[in-house]
């Protein structure tokens, strides 16, 4: 049985065991939705129509889908629904950035819209909280509760698109790029992140270019090695340190997959990817007198000498009780210039949305149950949240 058929059988078996529970069509890729319609005794092309209604037109009411006959609409209403996360809180920054706290069950995750002159980027969450315990990140301090479902991930894009609306009417630039850089580690939720990204790329849905969908990871190497077999999207690596001793401290997953292991995996991905223009994005948060010295820049250049990349230097964004300080502009500039001497492309990322705690590393959401992270920490020590991928 193929993966799509297995998925549909699982969904439909749940449906038969619990008739009151409807299938959320946002949990299905277009191919899975075609299988769903076949199970209903309908033509598979109906899936193409549904996907276009849901994502192109932002429609979640079957009655408004005028090219679908009434009998089928009634059948769909009986067994299916179209349900995206609702906005619990919206905050708007003076610089145009918008942060939404999206309600997912009893918890909330955060989604950030970042408009620029020539594009608009949506930063999407993949988990409720995060289990990786990076010491400089607010999300990690909230603990971990669970993975988001496909509908909770793609639903963030749907909800944001619905709010932003038509550029000609609202004056707000439509979403052109999606980055999986919100709450959570995407490669610890591959089963739901990949289908959500497939919907982003689908021409019947959002039709984004693979170069405009970026997955950011702290380095879950087995999942990264498998990623290219599942989907081709742009890749960003949350590196943040140039040596294992320091990275073990601030990005604890490094104890499981060290820098060399991670960079080797990145190079393998680049060898088969068409989405990255031959380069990976390296993310490096600047922590005052921790990882921002000239010696660190030289070490980073050595680590990346055989990896085509561009380097984003990210001014650290404070959060309560954090043990760090923000690097001075002088230290960041010196770090950049040192790397540029090695002919790297180095960009100092402009901080956006920090007045509403929407900047990099500040997303926290509302993680009610932290017991899972505590239990995982007891079992694995600092290597929490690491799942082997076959």
UniProtKB/Swiss-Prot annotation:
Origin organism lineage: Bacteria, Pseudomonadati, Pseudomonadota, Gammaproteobacteria, Pasteurellales
Disulfide bonds: 123-360
GO biological process: rRNA base methylation; tRNA methylation
Origin superkingdom: Bacteria
Species: Haemophilus influenzae (strain ATCC 51907 / DSM 11121 / KW20 / Rd)
Keyword field: 4Fe-4S, Cytoplasm, Disulfide bond, Iron, Iron-sulfur, Metal-binding, Methyltransferase, rRNA processing, S-adenosyl-L-methionine, Transferase, tRNA processing
HAMAP family per UniProt: RNA_methyltr_RlmN
Family to which the UniProt record says this protein belongs: Belongs to the radical SAM superfamily. RlmN family.
Reactions catalysed: adenosine(2503) in 23S rRNA + 2 reduced [2Fe-2S]-[ferredoxin] + 2 S-adenosyl-L-methionine = 2-methyladenosine(2503) in 23S rRNA + 5'-deoxyadenosine + L-methionine + 2 oxidized [2Fe-2S]-[ferredoxin] + S-adenosyl-L-homocysteine; adenosine(37) in tRNA + 2 reduced [2Fe-2S]-[ferredoxin] + 2 S-adenosyl-L-methionine = 2-methyladenosine(37) in tRNA + 5'-deoxyadenosine + L-methionine + 2 oxidized [2Fe-2S]-[ferredoxin] + S-adenosyl-L-homocysteine
InterPro entries named among the record's database cross-references: Aldolase_TIM, Methyltransferase_A, RlmN_N, RNA_MTrfase_RlmN, rRNA_lsu_MTrfase_RlmN/Cfr, rSAM
Cofactor: record remark: Binds 1 [4Fe-4S] cluster. The cluster is coordinated with 3 cysteines and an exchangeable S-adenosyl-L-methionine.
EC number: 2.1.1.192
NCBIfam families attached to this UniProt entry: PRK11194.1, rRNA_mod_RlmN
Binding site for [4Fe-4S] cluster: 130, 134, 137
An example molecular function term from Gene Ontology annotations: rRNA (adenine(2503)-C2-)-methyltransferase activity
UniProt-listed Gene3D superfamilies: 1.10.150.530, Aldolase class I
Cofactor(s), by name: [4Fe-4S] cluster
Additional notes on this entry: Reaction proceeds by a ping-pong mechanism involving intermediate methylation of a conserved cysteine residue.
Name under which the protein is recorded: Dual-specificity RNA methyltransferase RlmN
Function: Specifically methylates position 2 of adenine 2503 in 23S rRNA and position 2 of adenine 37 in tRNAs. m2A2503 modification seems to play a crucial role in the proofreading step occurring at the peptidyl transferase center and thus would serve to optimize ribosomal fidelity.
CC per GO annotation: cytoplasm
Pfam families: Radical_SAM, RlmN_N
CDD domains: Radical_SAM
Positions bound to S-adenosyl-L-methionine: 184-185, 216, 238-240, 317
